[in-house]
């Protein structure tokens, strides 16, 4: 059986990464638009995914990423020894309600006071690497590199 395939454009990078996470095939890119191959019987599901992304945790994660990218170097001393250098991990920690103190160089410093908070911070930092948010971040980065 030969399925009819339709080309569907997606202009938002976050939506494109989210759609890619749901196994839709990327056909190419034209300027800032990503083109996906979608079986005709999957068109409604595809469109529903685009809407779902805007109200998902992945959109929140992307919002945290964008905020962190805009963050300028903090000009004062930061009294914290808990930091991460991975932008995605920092966004993941922000989503889990850890308070960001500032950025120094490539490091994002967090406000941690108790051994329990430190343990939770370390656990969340490790969880990020195997989370769907890491996969989403990886897809964002890959899509940016497609010319």
Identify the function of each model-found stretch.
Residues 35-79, 106-147:
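Long, continuous compositionally biased terminal/linker segments
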């Amino acid at each position: 059986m030969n399925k009819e395939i339709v080309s569907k454009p997606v202009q938002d990078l976050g939506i494109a990464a989210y759609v890619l996470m749901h196994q839709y095939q990327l056909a190419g890119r034209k300027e800032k638009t990503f083109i996906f191959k979608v079986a005709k019987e999957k068109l409604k599901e595809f469109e529903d995914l685009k809407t779902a992304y805007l109200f998902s945790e992945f959109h929140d994660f992307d919002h945290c990423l964008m905020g962190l990218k805009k963050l300028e170097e903090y000009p004062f001393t930061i009294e914290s020894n808990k930091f991460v250098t991975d932008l995605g991990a920092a966004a993941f920690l922000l989503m889990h309600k850890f308070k960001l103190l500032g950025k120094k160089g490539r490091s994002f410093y967090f406000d941690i006071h108790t051994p329990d908070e430190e343990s939770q911070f370390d656990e969340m930092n490790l969880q990020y690497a195997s989370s769907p948010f890491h996969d989403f971040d990886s897809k964002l980065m890959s899509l940016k590199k497609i010319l």
